[in-house]
Amino acid sequence: MTEKEMAKEVGFKYYNYVSTVKNNVLEKKGHLAGPFYYLNFKKISSNRIRRLIIFTMFEKSYSYDFIVRLIKNIESWSFFYPLQESTFNEMMIGIYSTDHQAIIRIFEYLKEEGVLHYYSVYELEDNLLTYNPVFYKMSGKQKEDTHYIDQEIDMEMNFGGCVFDDKDQETMKLSHLDRRLLMYLQSGFLKGELSKIMKHNAKLVDEDGEHPYVWGYNSWRYSYEKLTKNNIISKFYVIYPLPKDICSYFFLILAGTDEETTRKLAAGVGSNCRILRSGGMVRSLNPEDKGKTCWCAHFRSHPLFMHKISSLLEVPEVRTKLIYYCKSISSHGNDSYPVSYMNYYTEQSISLENKYYDRERMEIRYDYDLYYNNIKTLIEKDHLL
């Protein structure tokens, strides 16, 4: 939506007011973030790359800090979200994978060594698609405000789950600049403003004291236009239903009686109210239900909806519902009352540096054997203490 279209929608006479409200009100008050970009993984690497979503439980004798430092040895990590613990500490972890079995081998080792009590692994089909809150709906010609709590699940829709056209999936050879820009755009770094990204890169120094990332603005602009034209990136914003520091956060893994029902549930849960959802279809890699299709989503909502979600899903169509409540982030950035686990709400873009990307083969490769050995060394040292 352009700023002119947004101005017309909200009733502003002058469209330049939109950017003022966006920058000075919505972003500062925690209602708006971005832009971010979806990446077309099939076009940036000729080998298969998917994101794994891994739920973990670990003994309270191991801190969140220790687990995060440990798993960050898997250099293709994507995110860490601490969850509300019960008998065990719990965390949701995302990892970009080119070899699922190699990653499962690492987590199985951690379980055998007693670091993890339990883990479950799901393969994400595509991107986690973001669906922003619905603040009003039409009733005839009248606009009606929506609510923060869904009263029922709309089963009339079907979850599409794909940003990019499956027919256009030819892998593209990416330059060094292309790959750096992709990482910045995916993470929303500097709001994707090319002039700021250019200046930031020009200041970076490598191990030899050189400045290897100096490119002119026209080069950055050309790369951005190439990535856009070739359907490699797609821009989106994140809109929070409440200021983000007072939203409740939780993950939901959901399955219906069959795949079609699961897709209808995925499309319907939270679709007609003020709820922010980022979700995608996943495939279980767990022995007890290997291959089962589910929907996995990260919700940001009013606290009352988080407490109601379980009862909302008490319907005949639901066969599996797993709800993982994230730890509160309401005191994030509050120096007077620091929260020890706050630094472990963290995300990073896919790693496309030279050491991971083979430009001739157009492949992304991660050294999982190295990561396994590094983690094994850390565990052995920990056991000696």
Q: Model segments located where?
A:
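A compositional/biophysical signature of low hydrophobicity enriched in polar/charged and small residues
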Residues: 1-385
